[in-house]
Amino acid sequence: MIQQLLREWPPGYGGVERVAHELASVWAGSVSSFDVQRRAGAEADALPVSYPRQVLPCSLPLGRLSLPLPSRPLWRLLCSREPLHGHLPSPGVLLVLLLARLLRPQRRVSVHWHCFLDPEPGLNGRLFALYQWVALRSLPWLSGVVTTSPLLARELVRCGCRAERVMVLPCCLSREQEQQMLQLPPRQRRSSTDPLRLIFIGRLDSYKRLDWLLQALATLSGPWRLEVVGDGPRRSAFEQLGRQLFAADARQRIRFQGRLDEDGKRRCLARADLLVLPSDRCNEAFGIVQLEAMAAGIPALAFQRHRSGMGWVGQLADLPWPQTPEALPAVLQQLAADPVLNARLGLQARERYQQLFARTVWEQRLQCLYPAADASG
């Protein structure tokens, strides 16, 4: 069995937690978490959990920085002979991985590199820049590196990782999620007078840039409707922006659904023609919700940013666009005006999902890649 370590409590709602959850469902090993947001026992699990979990005591966060505290669970994790797979970015996780490797040099200790961090101003930004510098220089000392897209793999190699130690394992859906999404019928082609039905799914924070989507929608000449699934500190600001841009029409055109469970999210996806994820940072590096949309037969739009695989996930042959914020209004207008293209892209999205991201494809990759990543110890 392979043990895992991550910052937050799985399965949660974030990409890192979901990846750890799916790995644990196959590996059946224990999952340790610092649970910085204190979610263990405070809320129901978003997905069924079949593996053991434990919380490792950690320091109170300084900004986003939280480090493990000495404890018996930590000592047992460090001294175990079982393979250990840690999820970055997290200074605390990196510290434990390095200590585990130091205590048992022959132990298999690998890392999942989920994203690079954009530089930010202030003390926090400098601390995380230092962390990323240390992390990149520590990777060759570990048994192997798994990342989520070919773009991130190339960037890791460019930063000094040996190519044979870097493995690509895209994110995946659970078997149940995949089955439910694939069972949704193909979208019926809407008429030219029907509104384009868009959906945004994610935490309502500054870097998700829902404001860019709202501003792009304000330029469209045809009818549209937007469902916003998720909650966060910027919700009221985004609601206010919607009222400023669309006045009395805002309530009719935009529905803020808040956080929904998996069934509620699936119902929203079943109504949608298009998913848009306009994130502006490379720490949004994959976007698992794109897989849900693509499996459901919905094209997904995301920006292709430096050190991110977001744009790569949903790229479709019949929609060549620059994948930049500046190009978003034009591509939305194109899809709003061409229902035939929109329907064809939905079929292509499902086909791309089945070829690259299907659960069976992921399981085959996992079976091959993880032993290869750790073969040398």
Give the residues covered by each predicted segment:
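Nucleotide-activated donor-binding/catalytic signature segment of Leloir-type glycosyltransferases, i.e.
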Residues: 239-263
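Nucleotide-sugar donor phosphate/pyrophosphate-binding loop at the beta->alpha transition
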Residues: 108-110, 118-141, 175
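Conserved acidic donor-binding segment of nucleotide-sugar-dependent glycosyltransferases
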Residues: 314-326, 333-340
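Short hydrophobic beta-strand element within catalytic cores of glycosyltransferases
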Residues: 295, 299-304
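Conserved donor-binding/catalytic core segment of Leloir-type glycosyltransferases
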Residues: 3, 189-208, 214-218, 227
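N-terminal strand-loop element at the rim of the active site
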Residues: 4-66, 232
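An aromatic- and histidine-rich active-site surface loop
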Residues: 70-71, 83-106, 110-118
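Carbohydrate-associated surface elements
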Residues: 151, 171-172
